[in-house]
Regions:
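Glycine/small-residue-rich hydrophobic helix-like segments
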Residues: 181-244
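Conserved acetyl-CoA-binding loop-helix of GNAT-fold acetyltransferases
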Residues: 82-96, 220, 226-239, 243, ...
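Conserved donor-binding loop and adjoining core beta-sheet/short helix segment
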Residues: 24, 34-92, 96, 204-216, ...
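Conserved active-site alpha-helix within GNAT-family acetyltransferase domains
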Residues: 110-129, 227, 231, 255-273
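Conserved hydrophobic beta-strand within the GNAT/NAT acetyltransferase core sheet
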Residues: 106-109, 215, 249-253
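Active-site rim helix/loop that mediates acceptor-substrate recognition in acyltransferases
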Residues: 23-53, 61, 169-201, 205
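Acyl-donor-binding surface of acyltransferase catalytic domains
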Residues: 66-68, 78-147, 275-281
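A short beta-loop-alpha structural element at the N-terminal edge
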Residues: 5-19, 150-162
Length: 284
């Protein structure tokens, strides 16, 4: 085992190769479900490495996006050092830095079991999970849209308004920033909006794969919820999938989002059994 004389410092662009090796070769690599690759954050001041004798052995990145919400975008460490040692050194630095910048809500979608005890030992709370649902191929009817409402393809020019819809539909912890949406849009396979009198009311953004699609985001302004607008966007997406000869559609949502779960279940989605805990920590 390495001597454990770890020094934590801000990550630098010159660390790119060492970090790439850690991410590629090591068994313990946590990556956030994101539109950006972990090393895209390398120039962020919220990215640190732990090294011994100039050798990078661990890394953590948690840049706030949107402001005030810092997801753990990356945590990885060499198999030559204990996970708890790497985490405690890096998390102590990150927590102190976040506090000095005014604080943040820190979140982790822990897909891998090895990471979860470290978070609980650091007093992270576990208020909810992400659950996966899959459409079972049942035909759906397109709900009638309210008078004056129009469904159309999303364009890049819509993105600032799309970000407004997103912020109006979700709490800050779950909001997608404009920068995130600008990265997501070119990667989408099918994205649509609902508008009335030139104002965007709702949107969906989906990605594609060989067998079907994944509904990555569905948002409806709070004041317009309850009018089956979300159902209309999902029904249109299902129609698009069927027209392309595809048969699979998946979606993730929060385990405690009853409105969302009810919508998807009514439209023929069933839970797959996959579930990922969401841990939170408030840095004041």
């Amino acid at each position: 085992m390495i001597g454990l004389d770890l020094q934590v410092r801000p990550a630098q662009p010159s660390d790119h190769q060492a970090l790439s090796s850690l991410i590629f070769f090591e068994a313990h690599v946590h990556r956030h479900l994101d539109w950006r690759m972990p090393l895209d954050w390398l120039e962020s001041p919220y990215f640190w490495v732990a090294e011994e004798n100039g050798r990078v052995l661990a890394a953590l990145a948690c840049p706030p996006d949107p402001p005030g919400v810092a997801w753990i975008r990356l945590f990885t460490h060499s198999g030559g050092i204990p996970a708890a040692w790497a985490w405690s050194n890096l998390w102590e630095t990150a927590r102190g830095f976040l506090a000095g910048q005014g604080g943040a809500q820190v979140g982790v979608i822990a897909q891998q079991t090895w990471f979860r005890p470290l978070l609980l030992d650091s007093a992270f709370e576990l208020p909810q999970s992400i659950v996966l649902l899959e459409w079972q191929g049942r035909p759906v009817l397109m709900p009638e849209l309210p008078f004056g409402m129009r469904l159309r393809a999303m364009t890049a020019d819509d993105l600032p308004a799309v970000a407004e819809v997103d912020a109006a539909a979700f709490t800050p912890f779950w909001t997608n920033s404009l920068d995130s949406l600008r990265r997501a849009f070119p990667l989408s396979a099918y994205s649509t909006v609902l508008e009335a009198d030139g104002r965007l009311i709702a949107y969906q953004l989906s990605t594609g794969h060989t067998l079907g699609a994944h509904l990555a985001r569905l948002a409806v302004r709070k004041e317009a919820q309850g009018n089956r607008l979300g159902a209309a966007l999902v029904a249109d997406l299902i129609l698009n999938i069927r027209q392309r000869g595809l048969s699979r559609l998946t979606v993730n949502t929060q385990s405690d989002n009853r409105t969302s779960l009810s919508l998807y279940q009514k439209m023929g989605f069933l839970r797959t059994g996959e579930e990922f805990p969401v841990y939170r920590f408030s840095v004041d």
